[in-house]
From Swiss-Prot:
The lineage of its organism: Bacteria, Pseudomonadati, Spirochaetota, Spirochaetia, Leptospirales. ATP binds at residue 256. PANTHER family: GLUTAMATE--TRNA LIGASE (PTHR43311), GLUTAMATE--TRNA LIGASE, MITOCHONDRIAL-RELATED (PTHR43311:SF2). Residues 320-347 are annotated as: Insert. It is an enzyme of class 6 (ligase). Its EC number is 6.1.1.17. It catalyses: tRNA(Glu) + L-glutamate + ATP = L-glutamyl-tRNA(Glu) + AMP + diphosphate. Belongs to the class-I aminoacyl-tRNA synthetase family. Glutamate--tRNA ligase type 1 subfamily. This is Glutamate--tRNA ligase.
């Protein structure tokens, strides 16, 4: 039984880098389960590795969680009953429990040097057996220990591991058996006085009354050490749930490089937090009715860690590598490279399109504004969530968007007033071959019809193709050149309803004057 009936989960990142894909999923699963059970979600910062922990990383992790909508009930910035919530501020607490374990002979000081330990490891390797610490100092007398302490000899503190079989009933992985004799006496306090990961985690989880430890399957091997420490300290053991491995499109474990992609990169690539939350929740979990698009606060209501699968979950955001050792992206901090490596048919894009379509328009505009600010081809007065023209444009095109970075080009196209032919190639599409005939027919048919929707314009262009005998590039490129001045850009059936009939006719007439193409009267 747990110490409290209230479900209490936690996320305990190390502030030594970005919040990456695996960490984000762990945080989300803990948050969602706590919310669905009416419990509390705690954020704790594990900064005992002082060589790697940085203030910048700490700030980025908090920013990432806030963007994702994973708001903590207790932790940094908000406080709580069981603080402090930063491990480096809890050293006196760990010291107190270390003294208790030493006094009860459940732990001992180890005076082995790093060189001696390395020699033992090499000896085990040479013998072809796993390295297990031999407990050299486990039975030293108090007098011997005090003598070494007087000499100022550095030491670590090791837990005296009892030999037994541990059976763990993991919520996701099922029954898992461990033989503790294969673990050996492990370090709980390092020679610098800081607690080891496994030790600090247990003390903190116990004192913060954590009822469920939800984390990646890579941490399963830490669980027996932690259970032994819970037992030694006399605390109830929480329930464990180890989420499935995340693999890439090639079915292999997500590379450290791909997996290290900051989730803020997806924000900067135009994905809404609602979308990314939805996508991450589906990496190893399914709803009872099989639905995948779960907008608003549905996830908080229905998420159940007992419905997580132990089968690997596929992170399909990046394209499948062509070669076995090839990375699709070489620099996972470069937004351009990340964008180019994105899989256009990913579930993330499908969810993103659904979210952008269904989300309240004011929320879409609010998230879109940062992507408009640097665009000089969009009037300043339009860059406002209350601007009716911007609202109208985004309402018209959002059904076509996979992410918000695609929207500024649509907005900018609406405000083109001085249409200019961009290149010799574009002029060629207008003047060569059947180009003039295609432009004339499009102009005439458009002038005598009243298209409104993308389907209307598709049908109109099909009619132009039938009359001129042109299709594909020889049909669309002259029309694109005459209406946009470019040889590439937005899909015409999407763009044309946005511009409207009158603006299109005006653009063709201007192009005609600029290039000398005569239009039928």
């Amino acid at each position: 039984m747990n110490q409290s009936k209230e479900v209490r989960t936690r996320f305990a990142p190390s502030p030594s880098g970005f919040l990456h894909v695996g960490g984000a999923r762990t945080a989300l699963f803990n948050y969602l389960y706590a919310k669905s059970q009416g419990g509390k979600f705690i954020l704790r910062i594990e900064d005992t590795d002082q060589n790697r922990s940085t203030e910048d990383s700490f700030k980025i992790i908090l920013e990432s969680l806030k963007w994702l909508g994973v708001n903590w009930d207790e932790g940094p910035e908000v406080g709580g009953e069981y603080g402090p919530y930063i491990q480096s501020q809890r050293l006196n607490i760990y010291k107190e429990y270390t003294e208790k374990l030493l006094k009860e002979k459940k732990a001992y000081r180890c005076f082995c040097t790093q060189e001696e330990l390395e020699a033992k490891k090499k000896q085990s390797e040479a013998m072809g057996v796993p390295y297990v610490y031999d407990g050299l100092h486990a039975n030293m007398s108090d007098e011997e220990v005090q003598e070494k302490l007087k000499q100022g000899i550095p030491y670590s503190v090791r837990f005296k591991t009892p030999s037994k079989t541990l059976i763990i009933n993991d919520i996701i992985q099922g029954k898992v058996k461990f033989e503790t004799k294969l673990i050996g006496d492990f370090i709980i306090v390092k020679s610098d006085g800081f607690p080891s990961y496994n030790y600090a985690v247990v003390v903190d989880d116990a004192l913060m009354k954590i009822t469920h430890v939800i984390r990646g399957v890579g941490h399963l091997s830490n669980t027996p050490r932690q259970i032994l420490l819970y037992e030694a300290l006399g605390y109830n053991i929480p329930e464990f749930a180890h989420a499935s491995e995340i693999v890439g499109m090639d079915g292999k474990k997500l590379s450290k490089r791909a997996g290290a992609t900051s989730i803020l990169a997806f924000r900067d690539l135009g994905y809404l937090p609602e979308t990314f939350r939805n996508y991450m929740a589906l990496l190893g979990w399914t709803s009872t009715d099989g639905r995948e698009f779960l907008p608003g606060d549905e996830l908080e209501k229905i998420f159940d860690v007992h419905r997580c699968s132990k089968s690997p979950s596929t992170f399909d955001v990046f394209k499948k590598p062509k070669g076995s050792d090839e990375e699709v992206v070489t620099n996972f901090s470069d937004l351009t490279q990340i964008a180019e490596a994105m899989n256009p048919k990913s579930k993330l894009n499908w969810l993103s399109n659904r979210t952008i379509r269904d989300l309240n328009i004011s929320k879409v505009l609010e998230n879109l504004l940062p992507f408009l600010m640097d665009r000089k081809d969009i009037p300043a007065e339009v860059k406002n969530v209350n601007n009716p023209i911007l609202t109208s444009i985004v309402e018209s095109v959002r059904v076509y968007l996979d992410n918000l970075t695609q929207a500024p080009d649509y907005v900018a196209e609406f405000f083109v007033t001085d249409l200019k032919i961009q290149s010799e190639e574009t002029i060629g599409f207008l003047k060569d071959g059947e180009g003039p005939k295609v432009v004339n027919e499009f102009y005439e048919i458009l002038k005598n019809s009243d298209p409104k929707t993308d389907e209307d314009y598709k049908n109109l262009m099909s009619k132009v193709g039938e009359v001129t005998g042109q299709k594909g590039k020889t049909l669309y490129m002259p029309i694109r050149a005459a209406t946009t001045g470019k040889s590439a850009g937005l899909e015409l059936p999407i763009l044309f309803p946005l511009l409207g009939k009158e603006k299109l006719l005006q653009r063709i007439e201007k192009t005609s004057k600029e290039t000398g193409i005569s239009l039928s009267n």
